[in-house]
Every structure is written in C-alpha cells, then in structure tokens.
C-alpha cells in the first residue's frame, strides 16, 4: 500500500499521543485526584492539539458528535438520577442539539484585507488550557459543548464541575477522551478532578497556565470569574419574560410559552420565566393556557403555600429547582 504524507502525519500524531499519555500525570481518561495534575496533563495534551491540522481536529469532533448521540439517553438518565432535576426526554433532546449544532472548525476562518497600504491578515490562535466551571442543571451538555468548541480552536479544557453532578460530568469527560483516542488524538483533551470543591476551583482560576476561564452557573460564580483578573466568559442566571401584546397570535403565544418554560422543567436560563401581557388580551391568553396547554390556575391560598415551600425562609429552596410540578 503506498504511503503518502497525510498517512505519515497521522502515524506520527498517534505515536506522539501515546508518548504524551505515558509522560502525563496518572489519570483515567481525564480524571485526576489533584487539580494541579489535571492541569499539567491538559497542558501536555494541548501541545499536541495545537499542532493538529483543522482536519485532524474536525475528525475528533465528528467522533465526539457520534458518541454523544449514542450515549444521549444514558447521560440524560444519569443527569436526572444524580441531581433530581429536569426530565429525561428533554435532556435527550439537549444532547442531540449539542451533537448537531455545536460549531466545530468550520467557524474558524482566516480574514484578509488588501489595499493601497498593504495586506492585513487575521489568523485565529488557541488560548492554551482553558478553565471551565460547569453547573449541575446542565452538566454533561455543558461539558460536551464547551470542549467541542474549545478543541476546534486548538485548546484543551480543565473542568471544575458542580459536585452535585460529578458522576455525570465524569462520564462526559471520559466520553470526550475516548473519542479523541479512537481518532488518533491525545488523552486528556478534557480533564477534571474526582472531587471538585471550591478549593479546586480556586486552584484552577489562579493557576499560571490557565489564561482564560469560562463559567456557566449562578451570578456568584460568574462574578468571581469575571473579577479574577484573567480573561473570562460568563453565562449566568437568566430571567427572561415573555411579552404578549395585542399584535400577537395569542393562541400560538400560549403554546410556545408553555413549551419553552416547561422544557427540562424550566432549567435553561433562556427558558421563559414569567409572562407580561397587556390587559386587552390577558383573558384570551389565560383561556388558551388553561384549556389547550394543561396549565393550572392556582388559587391565592395555593400560591401562598407554594411560595412558602419554594422560598423557604426567604431564600430559594434548591430542592425545588427543576422538579416536576407533581413533586412540588
């Protein structure tokens, strides 16, 4: 069989990956006891990833997409069972959305301008090892989506997942590294620690080899990241209202609002959290919500009882977040 240059590059890449695995701190597919060891392993993997061609990175990303679809139901069930939040059916859909819609290397383009004064060329380059904090509300989906985009750019990722979703998070990280190895890439493209804590998060954020931090979570986490002194990307809690006025298709609005706000038990920050309706259509909207979308109009007494449970002691009762209505 004739040997071409591409085949030689693939063979060299595979050998380098195996050498890298042998030299890295011990960890099974990205899982380490110490955060510093996890970062060191990701750093060594990133030296390989950044030298990969776009085609080689895309090959790994394609394998990740395939594995996500194959394991969508498993991860959906794990997430619900471990955290008690959300519902399996919607989480399966979210995993398929991650697999189908997460951008890969196709969005990394070169831009050039030419004119009387010369040529300007803009090339995208990797940050290196990116630190990421992920929530229990959307554990595996966030890890998978983050890694695919970051890997496309030539980066590796160190995660500090929410402790309440560590089993699901580890499963996702194992999946990512298995996909990389199967396609000739290195292990430890995504890493974490066995027992994530606030301390491990601080170690990660302060580490000299972490130039960029991405955080998905509550306002406290996002504030900490954006004030860390490093470059940060924060995705915090959302509280989006749905505004319905007299120009709306009220019937369709009712259906769309219910579909959005009930998706995965209202866990996504982009899901509708309240309705603001003008007086001229409010009765019509309520009619469609109740008669065609299985909504229940609670009495004042029922609202007060629910408020006592959900806002126990004036604070959000986290045991109520993402639960089915019948559980509440």
Describe the function of each predicted region.
Residues 26, 48, 59, 156-163, ...:
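Short coil/turn segments at secondary-structure junctions
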Residues 110-252:
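Rossmann-like NAD(P) dinucleotide-binding subdomain of oxidoreductase/dehydrogenase enzymes
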Residues 57, 187-191, 271-273:
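Residue-level recognition of the N-termini of beta-strands and the immediately preceding loop/turn
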């Amino acid at each position: 069989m004739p040997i071409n240059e591409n085949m030689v590059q693939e063979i060299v890449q595979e050998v380098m990956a195996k050498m890298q695995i042998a030299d890295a701190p011990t960890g099974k597919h990205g899982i380490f006891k110490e955060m510093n060891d996890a970062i060191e392993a990701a750093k060594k993997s990133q030296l390989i990833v950044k030298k990969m061609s776009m085609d080689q990175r895309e090959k790994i990303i394609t394998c990740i997409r395939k594995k996500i679809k194959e394991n969508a139901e498993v991860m959906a069930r794990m997430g619900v069972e471990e955290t008690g939040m959300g519902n399996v059916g919607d989480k399966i859909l979210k995993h398929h959305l991650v697999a189908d819609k997460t951008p890969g290397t196709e969005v990394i383009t070169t831009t050039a301008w030419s004119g009387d004064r010369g040529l300007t060329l803009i090339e995208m380059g990797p940050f290196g090892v990116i630190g990421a904090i992920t929530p229990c509300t959307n554990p595996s989906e966030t890890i998978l989506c983050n890694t695919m985009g970051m890997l496309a750019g030539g980066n590796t990722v160190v995660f500090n997942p929410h402790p309440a979703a560590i089993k699901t998070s580890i499963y996702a990280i194992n999946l990512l590294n298995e996909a990389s190895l199967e396609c000739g890439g290195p292990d430890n493209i995504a890493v974490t620690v066995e027992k994530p804590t606030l301390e491990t998060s601080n170690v990660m954020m302060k580490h000299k080899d972490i130039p960029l931090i991405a955080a998905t979570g509550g306002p406290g986490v996002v504030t900490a990241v954006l004030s860390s002194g490093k470059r940060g990307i924060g995705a915090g809690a959302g509280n989006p209202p749905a505004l319905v006025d007299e120009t709306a298709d009220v019937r369709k609005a009712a259906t769309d609002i219910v579909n959005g706000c009930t998706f995965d038990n209202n866990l996504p920050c982009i899901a509708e959290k309240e309705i603001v309706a003008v007086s001229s259509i409010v009765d019509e909207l309520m009619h469609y919500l109740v008669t065609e979308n299985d909504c229940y109009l609670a009495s004042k007494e029922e609202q007060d009882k629910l408020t006592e449970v959900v806002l126990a002691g004036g604070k959000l009762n986290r045991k109520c977040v993402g639960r089915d209505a019948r559980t509440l």
